[in-house]
Regions:
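Short, surface-exposed interaction patches in beta-rich subdomains
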Residues: 25-27, 31-33, 41-135
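Single conserved hydrophobic/aromatic residue that forms the stacking wall/gate
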Residues: 1-9
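Internal active-site segments that recognize and position negatively charged phosphoryl groups
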Residues: 20
Length: 135
């Protein structure tokens, strides 16, 4: 028998997986540190303050997430962010060694930079794979 004990609130979440996908939806935390050695990272409708996402082999996909500061690192795999908020004021640095960078459906070759006018930031570094950012 299972009994509901109410909501669980966590201000910080640190998660490391060796093999397997990570799917999180509706997460609301101040600090997220997520590392996946082999497997995809999928976040949907999450509210995050400071976040670090690291995938060795696997895709990273964020949909309708909000954040103040996010750093994403990928060795092999695509990174796709579809944000529900306007990031034009954010400091943004995107770069890939092998692959394409697209921002709002505009091809940017292998890198993109926006200085922004706020303290909010997004940094994505990818060794092999595409980066797509839509806001």
């Amino acid at each position: 028998e299972s009994r509901g004990l109410g909501d669980v609130y966590k201000r910080q979440l640190k998660l490391h997986t060796n093999v397997g996908d990570v799917d999180l939806s509706g997460l609301n935390v101040l600090s997220l540190d997520l590392r996946a050695d082999v497997g995809d990272i999928d976040l949907e409708n999450c509210t995050l303050e400071t976040s670090t996402l690291d995938a060795n082999v696997g895709d990273i996909d964020l949909e309708d997430c909000t954040f103040t500061s996010m750093e994403i690192t990928s060795n092999v795999g695509d990174v796709d962010l579809d944000c529900k908020e306007d990031l034009s004021g954010y400091h943004i640095e995107l770069g890939t060694g092998v692959g394409d960078v697209n921002v709002n459906d505009t091809y940017c070759h292998r890198s993109y930079s926006n200085q922004g006018d706020s303290s909010h930031s997004l940094t994505i570094s990818n060794d092999t794979g595409d980066i797509s950012l839509t806001y």
